[in-house]
């Protein structure tokens, strides 16, 4: 991949993370179709199937009874969230050895800016990607897929082209053949609802979405994100990897592929968000004393709840318990479409320590 003064962005994604870790914990189920799911729920939902289960049509967010119809031999394993967190922590520690230009986006994926890093590998980006893959496999026994391009959107799409354990590189010469012919539902963060709205106005492929003659009608569907998305898909985006910037707020949210009303499943998704924002908090050497959680319903009505802490913290467990308590107060067995976590009123960790020393 030639640089030509463009950024080189890598997207790293652990393959079938929950299912793979659970499989490592239960080697007796190796080569069996397995899925992590909510065993005790009245409306049990699949959280993460392994690739063998996926070959039967089993998908994340699918009701367990339906997954069992598709794959009668499917083995359901309970969530082991503390262990997932441990694997996630070690994964990001390994990546951090390569560069501090890392943006963690969930418990099992991140972006890195490899523009300068690749120079240490004879400007051979595939050599760098292969080295990272091998180290993750040797140390954690996990496979990862890597997508490489000149912005985050296309790098993430590249990852999906060659899963599992793949390395996909999309440069300017390949984007037309590899990306523009794809269905719009392959675009990151374009959910099922927006995809259906675009289908309704006869927009099916990415090349149709970026066509100038369709701008007006697509803008009515996508609103303010339209132009940034088109810039990304055309390679015009200048968005940086978030690394050592000073934040006023650190937040992360997830729109579900399907609306959820299962407390267990929503809690699992929320746990991932909490881990993501606390990882960012620590990486930036910041602390917070104010947290908030927000949920959005299928009607697009939004509910927000905030809590002021009595002291500054960057501790995962403290933030986890505070957010969990807020969620228990605000959640009333409703169906929700999106959940988000925000850490507010951030200060540098060193400044908090200075304040504490004044009272020693």
UniProtKB/Swiss-Prot annotation:
Its EC number is 2.7.7.7. The gene is dinB. Monomer. Disulfide bonds: none annotated. One of its GO terms (molecular function) is damaged DNA binding. InterPro entries: DNA/RNA_pol_sf, DNA_pol_Y-fam_lit_finger_sf, DNA_pol_Y-fam_little_finger, DNA_polymerase-Y, DNApol_IV, Rev_trsase/Diguanyl_cyclase, UmuC. This is DNA polymerase IV. Residues 9-191 form the UmuC domain. The record marks 18 as: Substrate discrimination. Its cofactor is Mg(2+). Binds 2 magnesium ions per subunit. It is found in: Cytoplasm. It comes from Ureaplasma parvum serovar 3 (strain ATCC 700970). Belongs to the DNA polymerase type-Y family.
């Amino acid at each position: 991949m030639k640089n030509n003064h463009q950024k080189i962005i890598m997207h790293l994604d652990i393959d079938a993370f929950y299912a793979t870790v659970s499989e490592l914990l239960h080697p007796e189920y190796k080569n069996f179709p397995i899925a992590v799911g909510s065993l005790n729920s009245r409306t049990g939902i699949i959280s993460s199937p392994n690739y063998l289960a996926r070959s039967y049509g089993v998908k994340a967010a699918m009701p367990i009874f339906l997954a069992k119809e598709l794959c009668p031999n499917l083995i359901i394993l309970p969530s082991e969230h503390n262990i997932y967190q441990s694997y996630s922590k070690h994964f990001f520690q390994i990546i951090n050895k390569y560069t501090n230009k890392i943006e963690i986006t969930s418990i099992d994926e991140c972006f890195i800016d490899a523009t300068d890093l690749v120079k240490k590998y004879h400007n051979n980006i595939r050599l760098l990607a292969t080295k990272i893959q091998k180290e993750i496999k040797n140390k954690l026994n996990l496979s990862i897929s890597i997508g490489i391009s000149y912005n985050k959107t296309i790098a993430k799409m590249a990852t999906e082209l060659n899963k599992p354990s793949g390395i996909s590189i999309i440069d300017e010469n390949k984007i037309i053949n590899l990306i523009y012919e794809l269905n719009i539902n392959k675009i990151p963060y374009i959910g099922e609802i927006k995809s259906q709205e675009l289908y309704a106005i006869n927009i099916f492929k990415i090349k149709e979405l970026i066509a100038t003659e369709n701008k007006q009608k697509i803008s009515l569907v996508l609103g303010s994100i339209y132009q940034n998305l088109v810039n990304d898909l055309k390679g015009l985006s200048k968005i940086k990897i978030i690394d050592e910037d000073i934040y006023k707020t650190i937040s992360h949210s997830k729109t579900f592929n399907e609306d959820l009303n299962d407390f267990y499943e929503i809690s699992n998704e929320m746990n991932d968000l909490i881990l993501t924002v606390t990882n960012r908090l620590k990486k930036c050497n910041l602390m917070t004393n104010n947290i908030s959680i927000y949920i959005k319903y299928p009607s697009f009505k939004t509910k927000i709840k905030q809590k002021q802490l009595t002291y500054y913290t960057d501790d995962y467990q403290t933030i986890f318990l505070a957010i969990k308590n807020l969620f228990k107060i605000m959640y009333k067995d409703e169906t929700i479409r999106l959940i988000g976590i925000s850490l507010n009123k951030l200060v540098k960790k060193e400044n908090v320590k200075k304040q504490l020393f004044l009272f020693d």
